[in-house]
Amino acid sequence: MKHIHLLLLAFLALFAGAPFRAAAEESFRDKVVLIPVGEDALTSKQSFGFMNRILERAQKEQARAVVFEMNTPGGLAWETSEMMMKSIQPLTIPTYAYVNPKAMSAGALISAACDKIYMAPVSSIGAAGIITSSG
């Protein structure tokens, strides 16, 4: 398990030297763009708007790759499916999901839309179902 974690870190170092935070204003050209998907990231339309703009910019500026660092219990189903189909799938640059420690529900769907999924030891992914407001 430890080897997988080290392999991912080596992979990121090889392609980017150091992870590049998506919020910075310098060019994404030839950089790995890291998009943290935290606990609340998939529960607001503003977060989806931000991630969609970052993905568009990464494509336009020819980033080397996009890595979604997943730590989410899930979120909005419609916005997630829109992001998968309209923002992630059309990308011509590689996309990776790094699950650390969880990608549940909408997080699992975003991970599935990526080219490859890497998981930290003792991480979990799954339970991608629609839950209504009544439970």
Regions found by a protein language model. Name each.
Residues 7-17:
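Bacterial N-terminal signal peptides
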Residues 20-135:
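Soluble extramembrane regions of membrane proteins in the secretory/endomembrane system
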Residues 1-5:
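Positively charged n-region of N-terminal signal peptides that target proteins for export
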